Regions:
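A short, acidic/glycine-rich surface segment
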Residues: 5, 73-76, 185
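Internal active-site segments that recognize and position negatively charged phosphoryl groups
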Residues: 83-92, 120-146
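Glycine-/charge-enriched secondary-structure boundary and capping motifs
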Residues: 25-49, 56-63, 133-134, 139-244
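Short, compositionally biased
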Residues: 98-112
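Glycine-rich anion-binding loops of enzyme active sites
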Residues: 13-102
Length: 244
């Protein structure tokens, strides 16, 4: 899912995968077959196929996938193309996977729709190519959290991004779960990852592709490239750090 979504975020269509597996001696055939079935099911969603890879034995289970894609003649959409005045928009669910994690950590198993969002993401795979065709200037998969990933765009583009919290629609499922756990649902939306939604910037006045919702604007850098929420820094919304 993560690899395909990253291809999507550059405006490309995933076409094929190569998969490497290191399997401990106690790995069962049944587990391998279930893994293969899940991989095939996700490939079917985007019309891709596993075209090769490698198998090896080892002490620990290791899985590695590389996805190849087709830009269909378009230029890749990078993180470095956002310009002051651009509109910031997002497509896909935000905060659902993080809500599912929070529910499980508190010892609950419901609402199932949120728990399942954590266990099985549902990315908007077709949104990347549509955004590219509509003139997106920068784009990123938000697997590490919306604010954190928009920070990558801000730094790569040398700009700042200002988000407006009242533009986010909090789904009833999120609101109910947040109330039960005494959590601000906006924190899940802004900092939670693993939903694999897409965030993109578009030129001002550009019609947004279907499914994209405007959530903020790109500005000239404010001292340094940063992401602000309602004009304020939010250090509590750091998202996931791969090296921390």
């Amino acid at each position: 899912v993560a690899n395909i979504s990253d291809i999507n975020a550059m405006g490309a269509v995933a076409t094929s995968l190569v998969v490497g597996m290191v399997l401990p001696t106690d790995t069962t055939v049944g587990w391998v077959l279930e893994f293969a079935d899940g991989l095939a099911a996700e490939c079917d969603v985007v019309g891709a196929a596993v075209i090769g890879g490698d198998l090896s034995g080892g002490e620990q289970l290791v899985l590695s996938a590389t996805v190849l894609g087709d830009l269909e003649g378009r230029s890749p959409i990078r993180r470095s193309g956002a310009r002051a005045g651009d509109v910031v928009a997002v497509c896909g669910r935000l905060g659902w996977a993080q809500a599912g994690v929070s529910i499980l950590r508190r010892g609950f198993k419901a609402p199932r729709v949120l728990v399942n969002a954590h266990r099985s993401a549902n990315p908007p795979y077709d949104a990347g190519p549509r955004a590219a065709a509509a003139g997106a200037t920068a784009m990123i998969d938000t697997s590490d959290g919306l604010v954190a990933d928009l920070g990558h765009i801000a730094r790569a583009s040398g700009v700042s991004i200002v988000l407006e919290s009242d533009r986010f629609e909090i789904a009833e499922e999120l609101a109910s779960a947040a109330s039960a756990l005494n959590v601000d649902p906006l924190t899940w939306v802004l900092a939670g990852g693993e939903d694999h939604s897409l965030a993109a910037t578009f030129p001002p006045g550009q019609d947004l592709p279907e499914g994209f919702i405007e959530i903020g604007t790109v500005t000239e850098p404010l001292a340094s490239p940063v992401v602000l929420v309602d004009g304020h820094m939010r250090p509590d919304l750091q998202g996931y750090d791969h090296f921390r």
